[in-house]
Amino acid sequence: TLFRSNVLPIEQDEKVTAMIHLREFPEDRYLVMVTRSGTVKRIQLSSIYTARKAGIRCITLDEGDELICVRETDGDQAILIVTHDGMAICFKETDVRCMGRDAAGVRGINLRPGDYVVGAARAKRDHQVLMITENGYGKRTDMDEYIRADGPQKRGGFGLKGYNVTEKTGPVVGVKVVSDEDDVLVINDAGVIIRMAAAGISTYGRTAQGVKIMNLEEGVKVISFARTDHEEEEEAAEGETPAGGPEQA
């Protein structure tokens, strides 16, 4: 409510999808937007600079569609899109031409009935693709399984199986690109958050089910997760306060 009233006046049925920290709006930087229905759009970062308090429209959405994620790019990256049913597609961002703010975008991934996009990320070689499911399962997969030797796929296809979704695992809730130096925060709909090292999550191929990474009580589901910088655990001697003072509540 505070964000809606003081920063960006949005409608009651709207919500903030992404926030990106920017200092400048150069001509050679871009925003890539991906929607729930698999549409992708690329615009120049400089085209959204505005002093208008009401903001500007950056994409025209079809009825029933919604913006899932926004990523800043340098114009020469690959984009990975992942769906609820575990399908994944990776293509060059240059496959998506730059458009004006009012354009609707183009097809990024074709979806089978009932499926929808849950996340997208900038693909990086020497990193891993992390997917986590509603029932607390997860896995890392080497990026090379998505970026072939001859380059990424072409946009607009059905993609490849990125997760073997079963009744046991539940559907995929999102995707992040991680390295061994990252940590991962996982949250469930009961409000419980756990933190773990990305390196501690096992690596499997695209068609594997992964392993249990969060124990859940009956009826509780994982709803989201985030990548964050790795935090070394420091063991303090008994009775001593760790360096830097006590952790704030």
Label for each model-derived stretch:
Residues T1-A249:
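Short, structured "edge-of-domain" segments at secondary-structure transitions
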